[in-house]
C-alpha cells in the first residue's frame, strides 16, 4: 500500500513522520490514520509535530497499514511474539502473528532470542500489516560469547541492520545509567527487565557508561534515515508491588525524558515505556509523572500488574492495571499472557492475552469518551435484547469463544433464534419478561391515548 508514498521520499536525509509534520506536511500516513481515528488530518500533523503522537512506519516496511499511537488516538495494544534460545520455529511464530492479526493486536514485537533471528524477523515483517518492534540488544548477544564483549560498534551495526530490514520501532535501553544501578539494590526483585539487566551487567564489567546512552545521537541518525520510532525502554521498571514508584524507576524516567527531547531535536519519533508492577492506587500518579518528565510523549505500559499472587492469571491482574493506566493517559498497552513469569507463551496464551488487553483498551476508550467508542457496545446490547445470538457473536471481541460457550449447553441451530439462554431458560429470562412488560405498557399507553383523543375526534362509531 505504501510503496508509492515511500518512493517520493527516496534520497532524503530525514524521512521521519515528525520531520514532515514539523515542516507543515500532512503525509499520506497522517491522512490515513486521521481517517482511521476519525480525526482531522491537521490535528494528526500537529500532534506528531508536537511529539504527542507517533506513527511507527519504517520506509522499508511497505506492507504496513499505518496507525497512530497517542493520547488523541484510540488506545492501542501490543502483542509480543518470538522464540527463545530453547525453542526456535519460524512457522510457529508466523502462526502467532496470524493469531495477533485475527484478534486485533495493533502492533507486534519480535522478541526472538535464539535461532536465526534475522530470518525470523524477515518472515514476520513481510507478513505483517501492523507495526513490528524489536529489542536489538537480544540479537547483539547472539554475536558474542558474553555480554561484556559487546561493543558500541556492534550494537550500532545491529540497529542499522534491523532498521534496513523494516523494523518500525525499537526498544532502546538508554536510560539505565551507571549511577542508577545502586538504586535498585534494595529491591525485592532487583532489575527485572532483560535489557536493563544486560546493560547493567555490561556497565559493571566494563566500568563504562551505557553505550546506548553515549551513542544515542548516532542511533538518532540511523532512525531518521528509515523513520524508526524510539520505544525508550524502562530497564529499571519495578518487578513487584513492593518495588513500584521507587528512586530507581523515577531516576530512569527522568533520563528518558531528557533522551526524548534529544531525539526530538533530530526529528525522530519517540514513545516511552513504563511499568511493570504497580499498586492500583499508584497508577494515576505514575501516568502523571511520565507526562511531566517526558513532555507528554506517548506512554507505552506493560500492564501494569496490580497484584503479584496470581501466576497463570497475570493476563487478568495486568489487564486491570492496563485499563486504569489507559484511562489516565497511557497510549499503548503491552499485553501480558497467562504464561507470564512461568514460560514462553504458546498460541492459546497469545490469544488470551490479546483479548484481555483489547477489553482493557476498549474500556478505557469508552471511559475517555472517544468518538464512536461505545457504538459496538450499544449494537451488541441491542442484539442481546433482541435475542439475535448470531449478531451478538459477530460483534464480540472473540466470536469463536462466545459461540462455543453458548453452544456448550444449547448446541442445536434452533437455539440461535431462542428467546433465552441456558442460564435462565424461557421462564426466568429477565429480558424476555421485560419485553412482555414493555409490550403490555405500550398497548396500555395506546389505549389510553385512544380514549383521550375520542372527544376531539368527532363522533364515535359504536359496534
UniProtKB/Swiss-Prot annotation:
Functional note: Catalyzes the synthesis of the hydroxymethylpyrimidine phosphate (HMP-P) moiety of thiamine from aminoimidazole ribotide (AIR) in a radical S-adenosyl-L-methionine (SAM)-dependent reaction.
GO biological process, alphabetically ordered: thiamine biosynthetic process; thiamine diphosphate biosynthetic process
EC number: 4.1.99.17
Pathway annotation from the record: Cofactor biosynthesis; thiamine diphosphate biosynthesis
Chain positions recorded as [4Fe-4S] cluster binding sites: 421, 424, 429
Annotated disulfide bonds: none
Top-level EC class as recorded in UniProt: lyase
Membership in a protein family: Belongs to the ThiC family.
InterPro entries in alphabetical order: ThiC, ThiC/Bza_core_dom, ThiC/BzaA/B
Residues that coordinate or bind substrate: 80, 109, 138, 173, 193-195, 234-237, 273, 300
Span of the signal peptide: none
Keywords: 4Fe-4S, Iron, Iron-sulfur, Lyase, Metal-binding, S-adenosyl-L-methionine, Thiamine biosynthesis, Zinc
Pfam annotation, one family: ThiC_Rad_SAM
Any GO MF annotation of the entry: zinc ion binding
Residues that coordinate or bind Zn(2+): 277, 341
Subunit structure: Homodimer.
Lineage start: Bacteria, Pseudomonadati, Myxococcota, Myxococcia, Myxococcales
HAMAP family in the cross-refs: ThiC (MF_00089)
Protein name as catalogued: Phosphomethylpyrimidine synthase
GO cellular component, one term: cytosol
Catalysed reactions, semicolon-separated: 5-amino-1-(5-phospho-beta-D-ribosyl)imidazole + S-adenosyl-L-methionine = 4-amino-2-methyl-5-(phosphooxymethyl)pyrimidine + CO + 5'-deoxyadenosine + formate + L-methionine + 3 H(+)
Cofactor comment text: Binds 1 [4Fe-4S] cluster per subunit. The cluster is coordinated with 3 cysteines and an exchangeable S-adenosyl-L-methionine.
Superkingdom per UniProt: Bacteria
Cofactor: [4Fe-4S] cluster
Amino acid at each position: 500500500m505504501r510503496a508509492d508514498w515511500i518512493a517520493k521520499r527516496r534520497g532524503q536525509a530525514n524521512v521521519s513522520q515528525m520531520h514532515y509534520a514539523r515542516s507543515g506536511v500532512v503525509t499520506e500516513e497522517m491522512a490515513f490514520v486521521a481517517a482511521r481515528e476519525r480525526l482531522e488530518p491537521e490535528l494528526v500533523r500537529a500532534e506528531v509535530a508536537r511529539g504527542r503522537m507517533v506513527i511507527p512506519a519504517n520506509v522499508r516496511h511497505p506492507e504496513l497499514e499505518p496507525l497512530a499511537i497517542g493520547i488523541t488516538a484510540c488506545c492501542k495494544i501490543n502483542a509480543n511474539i518470538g522464540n527463545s534460545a530453547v525453542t526456535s520455529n519460524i512457522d510457529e511464530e508466523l502462526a502467532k502473528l496470524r493469531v495477533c492479526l485475527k484478534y486485533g493486536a495493533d502492533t507486534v514485537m519480535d522478541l526472538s532470542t535464539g535461532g536465526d533471528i534475522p530470518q525470523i524477523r524477515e518472515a514476520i515483517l513481510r507478513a505483517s500489516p501492523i507495526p513490528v518492534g524489536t529489542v536489538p540488544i537480544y540479537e547483539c548477544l547472539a554475536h558474542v560469547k558474553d555480554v561484556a564483549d559487546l561493543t558500541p560498534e556492534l550494537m550500532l551495526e545491529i540497529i542499522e541492520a534491523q532498521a534496513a530490514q523494516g523494523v518500525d520501532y525499537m526498544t532502546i535501553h538508554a536510560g539505565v545509567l551507571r549511577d542508577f544501578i545502586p538504586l535498585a539494590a534494595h529491591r525485592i526483585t532487583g532489575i527485572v527487565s532483560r535489557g536493563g539487566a544486560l546493560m547493567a551487567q555490561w556497565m559493571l564489567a566494563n566500568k563504562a557508561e551505557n553505550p546506548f546512552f553515549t551513542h544515542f545521537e548516532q542511533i538518532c541518525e540511523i532512525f531518521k534515515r528509515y523513520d524508526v520510532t524510539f520505544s525508550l525502554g524502562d530497564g529499571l521498571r519495578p518487578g513487584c508491588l513492593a518495588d513500584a514508584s521507587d528512586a530507581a524507576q523515577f531516576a530512569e524516567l527522568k533520563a528518558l525524558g531528557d533522551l526524548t527531547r534529544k531525539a526530538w531535536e533530530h526529528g525522530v519519533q519517540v514513545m516511552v515505556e513504563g511499568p511493570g508492577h504497580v499498586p492500583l492506587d499508584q497508577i494515576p500518579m505514575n501516568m502523571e509523572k511520565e507526562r511531566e518528565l517526558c513532555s507528554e510523549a506517548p506512554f507505552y505500559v506493560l500492564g501494569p500488574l496490580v497484584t503479584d499472587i496470581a501466576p497463570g492469571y497475570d493476563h487478568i491482574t495486568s489487564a486491570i492495571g492496563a485499563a486504569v493506566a489507559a484511562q489516565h493517559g497511557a497510549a499503548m498497552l503491552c499485553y501480558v499472557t497467562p504464561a507470564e513469569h512461568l514460560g514462553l507463551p504458546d498460541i492459546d496464551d497469545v490469544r488470551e492475552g490479546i483479548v484481555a488487553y483489547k477489553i482493557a483498551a476498549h474500556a478505557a476508550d469508552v471511559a475517555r469518551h472517544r468518538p464512536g467508542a461505545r457504538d459496538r457496545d450499544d449494537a451488541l446490547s441491542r442484539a442481546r435484547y433482541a435475542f439475535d445470538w448470531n449478531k451478538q457473536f459477530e460483534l464480540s471481541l472473540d466470536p469463536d469463544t462466545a459461540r462455543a460457550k453458548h453452544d456448550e449447553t444449547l448446541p442445536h441451530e434452533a437455539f440461535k433464534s431462542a428467546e433465552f439462554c441456558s442460564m435462565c431458560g424461557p421462564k426466568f429470562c429477565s429480558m424476555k419478561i421485560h419485553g412482555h412488560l414493555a409490550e403490555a405498557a405500550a398497548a396500555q399507553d395506546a389505549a389510553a391515548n385512544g380514549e383521550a383523543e375520542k372527544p376531539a375526534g368527532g363522533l364515535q362509531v359504536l359496534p
